[in-house]
Curated annotation (Swiss-Prot):
ZnF endpoints (CHC2-type): 387-501
Start-end of Acidic residues biased regions: 614-626
Annotated positions binding Zn(2+): C387, H494, C496, C501
GO cellular component: host cell nucleus; host cell viral assembly compartment; viral tegument
Organism superkingdom: Viruses
Protein's recorded name: mRNA export factor ICP27 homolog
Biased segments, Basic residues type: 72-85
Function: Immediate early (EI) protein that plays many roles during productive infection including regulation of host cell cycle progression, regulation of viral gene expression or nuclear export of intronless viral RNAs. Acts as a transcriptional transactivator via interaction with the cellular transcription elongation factor SUPT6H and as a nuclear RNA export factor via interaction with UAP56, a component of the cellular mRNA export machinery.
Location relative to the cell: Virion tegument; Virion; Host nucleus; Host cytoplasm
InterPro entries hit by this protein: ICP27-like
Known partners and oligomeric status: Self-associates and forms high-molecular-mass complexes. Interacts with host DDX39A and DDX39B; these interactions are required for UL69 function in mRNA export. Interacts with host SUPT6H, EIF4A1 and PABPC1.
PTM annotation: Phosphorylated by UL97 and host CDK1, CDK7 and CD9. Phosphorylation by CDKs impacts on UL69 nuclear localization and activity.
Keywords, comma-separated and alphabetical: G1/S host cell cycle checkpoint dysregulation by virus, Host cytoplasm, Host nucleus, Host-virus interaction, Metal-binding, Modulation of host cell cycle by virus, Phosphoprotein, Transcription, Transcription regulation, Virion, Virion tegument, Zinc, Zinc-finger
Organism, as annotated: Human cytomegalovirus (strain Merlin) (HHV-5)
């Protein structure tokens, strides 16, 4: 560094040095390019004053030092090369014609901060001796463009000789050599200048190679490539959505399904003949098919639409929907309805498990699945489970297993272990009995839902999935409709000689029927009788005379038409083998109590219909006429409400019980004069006899031709005492919530 220790005025000119000395000086000046410079030696570069540059006594060495931005006579270490900066004068707007186009990296320079001066220092690139001659030609070609009138010379060659361009000595430019480390790494605009001409051909060559590769592929490889491209597109869309702000906002719940679409889940559109998926399925006559197979539910977007509607609902409306769902589940009228609701809920949960969807803990299905196993057991407990499961009169091991699957695990001591919890955690496919397997599915799904909802309330910022809680793989082995198939299949395949067991199965599978003899009230009736009265009943004018007869006295006496039609018959479509036998006994033994209490009856004004033996063997046509169990007639004058009722003849010690008639009304049962006085063994139903008016004309009812055949009758022996739960220790089987399970 002895050259830098010399005084500036004592330094010889570059032209007086030999070529070897000049190379040695340049090598010493740029030997510190790769060494870090201490911060205290780094100083801001400032343009030199014109007086210093235009001084007559300044040598060529001084001019070279001024062009690199030396502001003082003291030595400072060499600064590594930096990328050039381009900025215009802050005060004056220069003419664009006076500024050259972007130059190659080897000849980059920047405009200064004030006065339009050019900073020609270490802002360029070094190591010009390694540059090729092509860059020199570019520099020479671009040197003819005027830069700034303040400069008159530039050192463009290795000898340091000044070059004049176009006869104007004021337009000079200095070439700053580039360093090997920074060669080619310039401003982005320079990259366009270097590679702009080769970008097009390279892209065309790449497309040509891709085209050749595609031509060489067969059909299978093309399909695999297509699937791979689709997968990459979905991944890129998800990453782009997460970074661009189209993903769910911070206020959206963690279980939001905005990122899940039918295309991303590979779901096919649901068939057009299905009922439109809605979050409020309250229409009684749905337009469309509601029976869906396993594949239609699991591999279409039908359930996805229903789940998205739950997410779009506001919180108050969603809570109302949960209440509606709870009452619909807990008020299921019969076994068929409850099994359909259970399989609907389990299929909905299976859909989330299969496609890996985050679960909404406030979903109406998750709110109601906790009590379904207890409801199902209550329905099954009305059957003769000892005969169905154990083929005996009392309870056996299979009945006890079914009860343990439903009951709540007990709180045992520390040294005792309740095996109920272990039984409920067994995989459902390990049970051989169909009812056990069906109950195990319901129990497993219930435990998974309760565990997930408990975890979601504790950890609010993390989405929850069913596979995290499905410990016995019940959701993996479940198929849509499996619970209904197992239970109904077991009931249909059961064969025994017990008539009561058959009757219980028949009643369990039949639609709901209304059975009530009378509706008492105290001072005022708060009962909503519109639930029992039919919408298409007789008018008030047809029953005006019957209302007037009841107003005449305190006691209600049957009319002549009612007394004349005391012989009751069961509808042939619902008559069973033991109903025929009871019917024959009822005709031979009429009730003496009713025969003594009833007044003498007139012959029937209308001939009764008789059914042939072939009609008795017709199939049963199920009818749910629970909304037409009472026929209401109002007197125009006194507004007297009259209900045509039927009193069932009791058999000691059973009380009076009401049975449903053929049209839904409850008719008064009195003995017919054509029979004896012995009581019937089984109460039978009586066809509707129209009430006779004052003129003696019979009123016609419009519902007689519209009502379908009735369901099977209920025998007298099956009263409320006999139909009571047969389970031992049934008082201990109280309904509980699965939220208390451990």
């Amino acid at each position: 560094m002895e050259l830098h220790s010399r005084g500036r005025h004592d330094a010889p000119s570059l032209s007086s040095l030999s070529e070897r000395e000049r190379r040695a000086r340049r090598a010493r000046r740029f030997c510190l390019d790769y060494e870090p410079v201490p911060r205290k030696f780094r100083r801001e570069r400032s343009p030199t004053s014109p007086s210093t540059r235009n001084g007559a006594a300044a040598s060529e060495y001084h001019l070279a030092e001024d062009t690199v931005g030396a502001a003082s006579h003291h030595h400072r270490p060499c600064v590594p090369a930096r990328r050039p900066r381009y900025s215009k004068d802050d005060d004056t707007e220069g003419d664009p014609d006076h500024y050259p186009p972007p130059l190659p990296p080897s000849s980059r320079h920047a405009l200064g901060g004030t006065g339009g001066h050019i900073i020609m220092g270490t802002a360029g690139f070094r190591g010009g001796h390694r540059a090729s001659s092509s860059f020199k030609r570019r520099v020479a070609a671009s040197a003819s463009v005027p830069l700034n009138p303040h400069y008159g010379k530039s050192y463009d060659n290795d000898d340091g000789e000044p070059h004049h361009h176009g006869g104007d000595s004021t337009h000079l430019r200095r070439r700053v050599p580039s360093c090997p480390t920074t060669f080619g790494s310039s401003h982005p605009s320079s990259a366009n200048n270097h590679h702009g001409s080769s970008a097009g051909p390279q892209q065309q060559q790449m497309l040509a190679l891709i085209d050749d590769e595609l031509d060489a592929m067969d059909e299978d490889e093309l399909q695999q490539l297509s699937r791979l491209i689709e997968k990459k597109k979905r991944a890129r869309l998800q990453r782009g959505a997460a970074s661009s702000g189209t993903s769910p906002s911070s206020t959206s719940p963690v279980y939001d399904l905005q990122r899940y679409t039918a295309e991303s889940l590979r779901l096919a559109p649901y068939p057009a003949d299905l009922k439109v998926p809605t979050a409020f399925p309250q229409d009684h006559q749905p337009r469309g098919r509601i029976l869906l197979s396993h594949d239609e539910l699991m591999h279409t977007d039908y359930l996805l639409h229903i789940r998205q509607q739950f997410d779009w609902l506001e919180e108050p409306l969603l809570r109302k929907l949960v209440v509606e769902k709870i009452f619909a589940v807990y008020n299921a009228p019969n076994l068929h309805t409850l099994l359909a609701i259970i399989d609907e809920t389990l299929s909905y949960m299976k859909y989330h498990h299969l496609h890996g969807l985050p679960v909404n803990p406030h979903d109406p299905y998750l709110e109601t699945v906790g009590g379904m196993r207890q409801l199902l057991f209550n329905k099954l407990n009305n059957l003769d489970l000892g005969c169905i499961l154990d083929h005996q009169d009392g309870w056996g091991d299979h009945c006890s297993t079914l009860k343990r699957l439903v009951k709540k695990p007990g709180q045992m001591s520390a040294w005792l272990r309740d095996d109920v919890c272990d039984l409920q955690k067994r995989p459902p496919e390990t049970f051989s009995q169909p009812m056990h397997r069906a109950m195990a599915y319901v129990c497993s799904f219930s435990r998974v839902a309760v565990s997930l909802r408990r975890r979601a309330l504790q950890v609010t910022g993390t989405p929850q999935f069913f596979d995290q809680f499905d410990t016995n793989n019940a959701m993996g082995t479940y198929r849509c409709g499996a619970v209904s198939d197992l239970i109904l299949g077991a009931l249909q395949c059961h064969e025994c000689q017990n008539e009561m067991c058959e009757l219980r199965i028949q009643r369990a599978l039949a639609p709901y029927r209304f059975m009530i003899a009378y509706c008492p009230f105290d001072e005022q009736s708060l009962l909503d009788l519109t639930v029992f009265a039919g919408t298409t009943t007789t008018t008030a004018s047809n029953h005006a005379t019957a209302g007037g007869q009841q107003r005449g006295g305190d006691q209600i006496h049957p009319t002549d038409e009612q007394c004349a039609s005391m012989e009751s018959r069961t509808d042939p479509a619902t008559l069973t083998a033991y109903d025929k036998k009871d019917r024959e006994g009822s005709h031979r033994h009429p009730s003496p109590m009713i025969a003594a209490a009833a007044p003498p009856a007139q012959p029937p004004s209308q001939p009764q219909q008789h059914y042939s033996e072939g009609e008795l063997e017709e199939d049963e046509d199920s009818d749910d006429a629970s909304s037409q169990d009472l026929v209401r007639a109002t007197d125009r004058h006194g507004d007297t409400v009259v209900y045509k009722t039927t009193a069932v003849p009791p058999s000691p010690p059973a009380p009076l019980a009401g049975v449903r008639s053929h049209r839904g009304e409850l008719n008064l049962m009195t003995p017919s004069p054509s029979h004896g006085g012995s009581p019937p063994q089984v109460p039978h139903k009586q066809p509707i006899i129209p009430v006779q008016s004052a003129n003696g004309n019979h009123s016609t009812t419009a519902t007689q031709q519209q009502q379908p055949p009735p369901p099977p009758p209920v025998p007298q022996e099956d009263d409320s005492v006999v139909m009571r739960c047969q389970t031992p220790d049934y008082e201990d089987m109280l309904c509980y919530s699965d939220d208390m399970d451990d």
